[in-house]
Structure formats: structure tokens, C-alpha cells
Amino acid sequence: MAEEGQVIGVHTVDAWNEHLQKGIDDKKLIVVDFTASWCGPCKFIASFYAELAKKMPTVTFLKVDVDELKSVATDWAVEAMPTFMFLKEGKIVDKVVGAKKDELQQTIAKHISSTSTA
């Protein structure tokens, strides 16, 4: 497992399921960056996404390469990159499509404030 404050690269379906289950068990907000190695905007926002992970250690930040995990991208209906999915207790609570720094940060903040701490 990665340390808090890091973006966790998910490379297998088993790892994906494990992280989802951990998020459900811990009642943590999970933000998933669906990305691709050939996607320019994905590269543009990657360092910003990593900065957010450092600033918000209570949130789990995952990164999924859609070419590496096609089945996961298909299951979650990802049609454009980057797509950021916000999950709580295994359900999608929000989504940001595109390299939109402000919208990404605001959406995370909105869902952190609505998460009750145990």
C-alpha cells in the first residue's frame, strides 16, 4: 500500500477492487484519475493531481491507465481522458471530465466537507 498523500497507480483489476473495498471500509473519499500515456491534457494535470494528494492525505487518490485496465474503464463508462471520478462507499458521487484544475479542486473540497469523520 502506498503512503497517505501519494497518488496510487492501479495496474490490475484485483488491485482496483482492493482499493475500492478499502475506501468503502474506511469511508474515505476516493478520487480516480482515468488517464492515458498518449493524452496531453492528462500529462498537464498529473503534477497538480499529485500536489492535491499531498495536501489532502484524508482522500485516496488513484490513477488508472485506460489502456492498461480497459475493463475497468469500460465498467465505469469512461469516454474521455482525463476523467476524474469521485467515489464514496463504492458509488460515483461526482465526475469531472477534462484537465480542469479549479473544478477538480472545488469538487474534492465539496466532498471532503460532506464526509463525516469517524
Swiss-Prot record:
Protein's UniProt keywords contain Transcription regulation: no
Pfam families: Thioredoxin
Keyword Membrane (UniProt): no
Family per similarity comment: Belongs to the thioredoxin family. Plant H-type subfamily.
GO cellular component: cytoplasm
Protein name as annotated: Thioredoxin H-type 2
Alphabetical keyword list: Cytoplasm, Disulfide bond, Electron transport, Redox-active center, Transport
Protein location: Cytoplasm
PANTHER family associated with the record: THIOREDOXIN, THIOREDOXIN H-TYPE 2
PROSITE patterns (alphabetical): THIOREDOXIN_1, THIOREDOXIN_2
Active site per the UniProt annotation: 39, 42
Lineage: Eukaryota, Viridiplantae, Streptophyta, Embryophyta, Tracheophyta
CDD domains per UniProt: TRX_family
Domain Thioredoxin: 2-113
SS bond list: 39-42
Summary of the function given for this chain in its UniProt record: Participates in various redox reactions through the reversible oxidation of the active center dithiol to a disulfide. The H form is known to activate a number of cytosolic enzymes.
Site feature: Deprotonates C-terminal active site Cys: 33
Site description Contributes to redox potential value, residues in chain: 40-41
